[in-house]
Amino acid sequence: MKSILIVDDDIDTSVKYKQWLEEAGFNLTLINDPESAEHHFKPGKYDIVLVGFKMSLMDGFELYDKLHKVSEKVEGTPQEFKICFMTASVINYRALAEIHPEFGQECYVSKNVEKDSFIKHVNSLIACSC
């Protein structure tokens, strides 16, 4: 069973996504506080991490950096993990590519997406070697 960590302070949306993904057969961990996520994150435990793009305590990129540092502490070299940023905003991919070229368009998903599209997107990210 594939394992997913969802970190988002938008409780309604994250609970909805958790329910959708559990119904699709995924094992889910949901954390609504990004600072708690930093302390609970275990490298290698999750097939993908879904993170809120804009959160009140820190944005998704800040959390990614913190999780990356946690993964470095485990064995001295960072263990790669897949991440997808969830956002309700319109995404300017060109501007994001200049700031974070390591993330392609597939690493973002709209919070306004339909259930089937969301599950399909998550499955494709888990399956890809990106």
Predicted regions: what they are:
Residues D8:
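Conserved acidic carboxylate
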Residues M55:
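Receiver (REC) domain active-site loop signature in two-component systems and cognate sites
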Residues L30-I48:
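Acidic, metal-coordinating helix/loop segments flanking the phosphotransfer/catalytic sites
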Residues E62, P78-Q79, S89-S110, D116-K120:
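Alpha4 helix (beta4-alpha4-beta5 surface) of REC/receiver domains from two-component response regulators
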Residues I11-T29, F103:
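Two-component/phosphorelay signaling modules centered on CheY-like receiver
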Residues G52:
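Active-site residues of response regulator receiver
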